[in-house]
């Protein structure tokens, strides 16, 4: 397969919110469609924790992207109409500078010497990409999961840079349940003896810790309703079971194992730790004197769609309502969409049947509306 990624060298030094700075840092991104002469048809997508910038296929890289059925010619994010941009998060190992990158000061990987990462840093790096393309205002900023929090930071830190926003299954701050789950995921990685304080290699790799972390994640990304419908209490065939005490016996256990096996070596453990903690730290209330509502009221956009799903236990529907109410109080025209999907937090990735009409409909209405001058 080809590689459609492009790279932007960030300003050097690049200051980080929680202290420290990066030198010679860069971020990876991909684009689809054509930027029009007025440069007012750009749509930026910010991702969850683990995806790359490869949102959908293109001529340079025809492999399916992580949102393949949502973006492309004639799809909800119609690249015949919109100039779509997807940025790989700063701190991710999918092409951007991250803990696995070489520190130019030492020639060795940063590992745990990488500065503390905040989602505000992710937002600032994404804004640098947009600015480098000569775009002063995005037609729409779409943020999914962790990327939704990064999107809120983007709009707060760069007022007037976004016309409309689509918030997808995200939150204005992490609730205790989400923090607790991510804490267990990080603990599983750190307690793997091969993690070795962040110093590992392919021969000595924290496979077990990453596997447990992924399994915990998958459990929170879906819903009990889906588990019951798909697996019930169905057991594995005898030849599929593990021949050891307390080994895998139920189909749901095998499903989790398969997910973990496919993920373990595809994402750097230290990057996982950094982005996971950044998700815990983000709190829009910091921008509203301790109030989530007042923090959201500082965001100045024309209109927004806030989408949530009733079975999401990681970012509950009530948090989507908070975002909708706050943006509306700030003066935006807000559409709140509560979807009834059994697939939980991951519904935006798999329940395209419900998400696509909502997102595509909003973008169609945005395209038909006159663009104001801020």
Predicted regions and their residues:
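Catalytic-loop region of hydrolases
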Residues: 1-45, 59
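Conserved hydrolase catalytic core segment
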Residues: 137-179
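Alpha/beta-hydrolase-fold enzymes
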Residues: 161, 167-262
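Conserved acidic catalytic loop of the alpha/beta-hydrolase fold
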Residues: 107-109, 113, 120-139
